[in-house]
Amino acid sequence: MVDDELAELRRRRMEQMQRQAMDQQGMEEEAARQQQIDAQVRAALMEILEPEARERLNTIKLTRPEFAKAVEQQLVMLAQSGRVRQRITDEQLKALLAQLTPSKKEFRITRK
């Protein structure tokens, strides 16, 4: 009876260790896949953006990473669909950013 319990504990522990190993392997594969996607996005941006525009996008990425990610995705989609015929300049990127930036409500406080 003690041997059966010990064997059962060993079996459970072995299953747990196998699950952990598989989970870790899955996370490593996911991280590698994400790195590959990021590298492809960077390569695409290098091709479609002028250096000044790329610098502006990197500055935005430091302050608003989620917004920069959305802009990057938008630029890559435009390039993949063939709507970008030449490299995007800093001025064109500014115009795109102005379109994507949600308008802010302006509040005025008046005293009587």
From Swiss-Prot:
**Which Gene Ontology cellular component terms are annotated?**
cytosol
Q: What Gene Ontology molecular function terms does this protein carry?
A: DNA binding
Q: Which SUPFAM superfamilies match?
A: Double-stranded DNA-binding domain (SSF46950)
Give the signal peptide, or none: none
UniProt keywords (A-Z) are: DNA-binding
Under the heading InterPro entries, the entry gives: DNA_bind_arc, PDCD5-like, PDCD5-like_sf
Q: Which Gene3D superfamilies match?
A: PDCD5-like
Superkingdom of origin: Archaea
Q: For the region Disordered, what residue ranges are annotated?
A: 14-35
Cross-referenced Pfam families: dsDNA_bind
PANTHER family registered for this protein in UniProt? PROGRAMMED CELL DEATH PROTEIN 5
Q: Which NCBIfam families match?
A: PRK04239.1 (NF003268)
- Which HAMAP family does the record associate with it? dsDNA_bind
Q: Which family does it belong to?
A: Belongs to the PDCD5 family.
* The protein's name: DNA-binding protein Memar_1972
Organism, as annotated: Methanoculleus marisnigri (strain ATCC 35101 / DSM 1498 / JR1)
